[in-house]
Amino acid sequence: MPLSGDLLRLADAVLFPGFAGHEPPDWLRRRLGEGLAGVALFSRNIAGPAQVARLTAALRAENPSVLVGVDEESGEVTRLEAATGSSRPGAYALGVADDVAMTEALAAELGADLARSGITIDFAPSADVNSNPDNPVIGLRSFGADPALVSRHAGAFVRGLQSAGVAACVKHFPGHGDTAVDSHHGVPEVAADGFKDALLPFADAVREGVKAVMTGHLLVPSYDGELPATLSPKVLTGLLRGELGFQGVIVTDAIEMAAVAGAYGIGGAAARAIAAGADAICVGGEHADESTAAGIRDAIAAAVTQGLLPEERLADAARRVRELAAWTASSGSAATGSQGRAGSGAIAATGARSGARSGDRSGALAGARGDGGAGLVAARRAVRVVRRSTTPELPLAGAPHVVELAPEMNLAIDRHTPWGVGEPLTRLLPGTVVTRLGSGEATGPALERLIGAASGRPLVVVVRDVHRHPWQEEALRHLLSARRDTVVVEMGLPARSDLGAVHIATHGSARVCGQAAAEVLAGSL
């Protein structure tokens, strides 16, 4: 049976496809004119603020009410600053600093930047409680392992973003923190132990008025032993809508991920997600072509004609998406070039207001722009130093040899985003030598050559989640056995602080986190 135009338009009203390039392709312009609800931007679409503003203006010229979304968590997952590294630390660093007013102020600054670029929904923050240090995909994206800490900072992030007129979207419901499987590749399972704690940040975000919640492709046997949360009516309709009382937009994580598409295909997973209670389908991180977007639309429409998806459920989803678009329009963020309600330079004023409301002991970030930027101030406050020896001295006596051990990143993190300590330290201590090694390069002979090359210099070894990568552990052990005066800088999750004569934990790998560590090493902090 041919699919009706009205039904296809209704299916388009719940889709957020991605695309390739810095300008919208013809197929996307056409679909927007036909009523496509949203677009998801990725780093491949972003060259700079002015270009993004032109891009979103072009999208809005085809559909004035289009929702433009982006995964901009700051820190490890950045789309706006993928080419340079983030100027703001990620969630874990903010949790370590544990200044709620600072978190809210940084989120308001981010929201103002997004609003000026014409972006109306940010798929952030992560409200996951990272209770499993071996989690391969959350880690530093979480505010921490304590549910109460995650809850207060996720709430602050929501307030900050939405004060700028940009919708926040907490993720990955009902909590991806206590898992050991990356849902890009498989189906993580959430144990019953600790599930109540994992829900706390989401429940509090709902009370905070968060506009959107992103589902996790997770199996929650205590609610549904067969279907992952994204496809489960028991989790989405029963738990999120019924028990938590959420009335905003339920957004899926990327529907092409193996945890859901592996069993049902991309289109089948999308239709099942809407039937389960989701309102918007994100796609395009890995499949950014016209045929994928058209196939999902057709699969949703076909599910209605086949009786698998009630048309009223699809219409309800489209209504919720329209209401969110109306909120962003009334907030002022939907017009390209808008500064949102937070406005230009809002960080100082927002910080002052937040500090007054929250009893902040730091004065939030007022005046921070004159000291290297608000994000750098926050990154400095997250650095922790553990000394196990009086040698080497800090600051370093001379230009060091920096060895950066670089693991492969998960798919949520742009693999081209720069990170490390070597580059900023080279600026602070001219003559610094930097060597970066991947897993296949950190061989015994290569490490011996490095030890020889570093003779007479301080040695700094930079690692990232060393506890999750045996090759990093082995390389570090090799270097420490030869140079007991080594400074170790951990830019991932610091599961251990007893490595090196001096251990510096940045609690993040954002550009500003590397800068903050370099300042400690050079004595310029």
Question: Language-model features: where?
Answer:
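Preference for extracellular/luminal or secreted protein segments
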Residues: 1-34, 263-525
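Second-shell residues forming the walls of enzyme active-site clefts
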Residues: 18, 44-64, 68, 76-79, ...
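Catalytic domains of carbohydrate-active enzymes, especially glycoside hydrolases
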Residues: 30-42, 109-111, 116-121
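Short beta-strand elements of ligand-binding domains
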Residues: 68-72, 123, 485-493
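A charged helix-plus-loop insertion that forms the helical arch/lid used to bind
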Residues: 84-99, 142-144
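Alpha-helical scaffold segments that flank or form the walls of functional sites
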Residues: 98-119, 198, 269-275
